[in-house]
Amino acid sequence: MDRVELHDVEYGDCTVLVGQNRQILMVDCGSVSRYARRGEEEIDRRFNEIFSRYAPAAQRQFLLTHYHRDHMSGFLKQVKKDPGYFDRVYLPALPCDKRGVNPVLEFAVFAHFFAVPQSDFAQVNTTCLRIFDALNDSVGADRIFTLGGGDIFTFDGAFYEVLSPARNEPFPFDAILTEAVENLNICLSSPFHTGRETEFLETKDAFVRLYMQCQTAFAPSDRATPGRRRILLDSLRDLLGRMEDMRSNLAHSPAAPDIQDILNQSVVRNVYTETQNDLSLVFHNRRSRGPSNLDILMTGDVSDEVLRRISGKLFDGYYIVKAPHHGTESHFSNVIGDLAVAHLLISNGDYHAGGEISQRYIDMECIKHCTNAGACRWRDIAGGCCNRLQRCYEQPASGSLTLKCAAAAGERRTPCNIYVFVCAVVRRFDDIRG
């Protein structure tokens, strides 16, 4: 890995690992914001500039940590506009509970077919249902890969290991979500229904089972044959289409109001959203020797609970750590705070429901690289960056204050090889190479 580039997409995420051989791995690309506040231009323009920057790359890979708008909206628009842009796309595999039930998929199906249309895209996001179909029509089935805990993938000649969520182990889902899913199924299970409720339940169950088979068939290891993958995708599309055909009938079902009552409970919606966060792909590099400046930990939007569960798999320290969930206090973890971290990446922005950057990250003895200071109370109070009195050991005079960084004097190349793009115009891919 040659460098890491962090892009300001307001309240969203877009982190790009740039390889030595003109390869890139883009981890997430999305935002809940409509505008990039500094210039008030539409956020789509920012996405276009980002994708234009990496157009000259020899190979472009994309990894989606989880199915939330602030991590995938730009990506979905790009693959629709330019299906061949990414050579490989990694998707998160959604795990089951100890009973073999996948409550996230189950809830998503009910929300997709019964919920009243919402303006808040991130609240009950059901993109996971159509992701295989959408990417099959755009990037093509051969470029789709699913990842789960224990899987290994490669980038720029190095191996990266997925730490969470485990692919073959039950996930400890919140009881609020599992009970909600049970109640949703009960609503359609009455023998007194005279519509297509029973048919919908059977089709839904078949869809979820087939979806799980697709996740296995598209894994990096034990990958199914192209013919088998094509059959699975065609069957998945057929089942989704059959449920769509039942939509108007289901809208008049006596069970519909009860189902909508469950879906509209704020506590249930919030748990579903936080569960999606906790199912983020967490990954790090595999060391070939000892610690190095190639050590990186990417955390998606996971909570402290998830990080504590996988803490035994983490290194004692990392050169780069991506702060989970935009560096907010709600997702701060002492697991991160106790690591020896050289550089911390924080992607935050202007969003009323987002949250400020945690003071506990600011207190960490590492260099913080932030896309947007608008959510930083420290900067508002102190009138400057918390890095001013930090020492950077990547500078030629090791341990010099960050104020003496060559990049601060206008040099194109930073000693740490970490770049934050916050301006409206993003330079071309080759402009930073030393």
Regions found by a protein language model. Name each.
Residues 2, 77, 81-295, 384-434:
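Flexible, acidic/histidine-containing loops and adjacent segments that form or flank the divalent-metal
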Residues 1-57, 270-271, 275-304:
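Conserved beta-strand hairpin/beta-sheet module of binuclear metal-dependent hydrolase folds
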Residues 58-70, 321-325:
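Metallo-beta-lactamase
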Residues 9, 28-32, 67, 149, ...:
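Active-site metal-binding loops of divalent metal-dependent hydrolases
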Residues 23-25, 58-61, 88, 160, ...:
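Structural motif
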Residues 324, 328-341, 345-434:
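C-terminal regions of proteins
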Residues 22-62, 73-82, 173-202, 302-317:
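Pre-active-site segment of Zn-dependent metallo-hydrolases
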Residues 37-50, 75, 107-133, 306, ...:
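Well-ordered, non-membrane alpha-helical segments in soluble/globular domains
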